[in-house]
A protein has these predicted regions:
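Short, aromatic-enriched amphipathic alpha-helices that serve as compact interaction elements
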Residues: 11-26
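Exposed acidic/polar residues on beta-strands and adjacent loops within beta-sheet cores, strongest
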Residues: 28, 47, 71-81, 117-120
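Short beta-strand edge/turn micro-motifs at domain boundaries
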Residues: 93-120
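Mature soluble domains of exported/periplasmic/lumenal proteins and thiol-rich metal-chelating peptides
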Residues: 52-53, 68, 75, 109, ...
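Hydrophobic residues embedded in beta-strands of well-ordered beta-sheets
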Residues: 38, 81-83, 107-110
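Bacterial N-terminal signal peptides
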Residues: 1-7
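Surface-exposed, charged secondary-structure patches
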Residues: 55-94
Length: 120
């Protein structure tokens, strides 16, 4: 029980760290949670690639959308070590819905998908 609690605390801390990276729009460090199987989907366009290429996709989104705030709406987990974060990026004129899904192994969190859609 103690080991499971320690693993859960470490995973929660890592999720909190990841949320801070999204709040600060730190695409380079966000890309450290990505791998070549990860997807970034922005307004239905799917982006794949290595972590550097994916960091450029996020940089482009941050520059073009001019978002300045990230707010977590809900976060949770499910069976099979799947963790999700629902959030919103907002600018002065637009709001973007964000869904981040992650998998947790014994040693790390990996982003499976980042889905960003402009709210109409």
């Amino acid at each position: 029980i103690i080991i499971n609690t320690i693993l859960l605390i470490n995973a929660i801390s890592s999720v909190d760290d990841l949320i801070i990276l999204f709040e600060t729009k730190n695409s380079i460090n966000i890309s450290g949670y990505l791998n070549t199987k990860s997807q970034i989907i922005i307004d239905e366009k799917i982006h794949k690639g290595n972590s550097y290429q994916q960091s450029l996709v996020l940089d482009d989104f941050f520059d073009v959308s001019d978002v300045d705030r990230f707010k977590v709406i809900h976060r949770g987990g499910s069976e099979n070590n799947l963790i999700y974060i629902l959030g919103e990026y907002s600018s002065n004129t637009d709001i973007y819905k964000v869904l981040i899904t992650l998998t947790k192994s014994e040693k790390e969190l990996t982003i499976k998908k980042i889905k960003i859609d402009k709210k109409l």
